[in-house]
């Protein structure tokens, strides 16, 4: 089994290192990840300047681009084969609800899915430094082996969120839906010493809606959340409504 790993926290992030070490039990591991943090870059693809990939270890490349760039370079250039699975993570911080649209971690898995490769995004629900990623890494190994054995539905990838708890306190995984979040007061408006305004998009409390069956509902109760996401963003329930508009 050939496994491509990436992330958005950077190639030297402890979550990625823990994942790479754990995944060796399944086969050959290749790491192609950003050379610096690329959190919240979404599905950005670099088109207006060249990319560089530096080999910094055995089967380890640091790319001066986004997680999506890393998957592209890996599959189309740096690797001489198509990986059996792409695993993105382990992200330091949750990727729940609407936040998946911002996530470089999730977008890397989405990019692999666009290329027809099974993919998983894995996040640890924490913001703390020095976090222990072992439990999340072991679950990722188990899930990757299952995906390899059973496959995934077409155009589907898995978004995994693991609560930051001692392994013995983590409750069984649940298949969940993508949750919802309330966004309020995220812009910090300040004036610099020269009298010019500047703005900072700051972090806020999670403010997730506690919807039964959702990703947040699961992790807030100590469960691992596994959410199947897919590429088709069409809102099929709205098609009939729009067709009634007079402009069509």
UniProtKB/Swiss-Prot annotation:
A divalent metal cation binds at residues 8-9, 39, 91. Its EC number is 3.1.3.5. Pfam families: SurE. Binds 1 divalent metal cation per subunit. GO terms for cellular component: cytoplasm. Its cofactor is a divalent metal cation. Keywords: Cytoplasm, Hydrolase, Metal-binding, Nucleotide-binding. HAMAP family: SurE. This is 5'-nucleotidase SurE. It comes from Geotalea daltonii (strain DSM 22248 / JCM 15807 / FRC-32) (Geobacter daltonii).
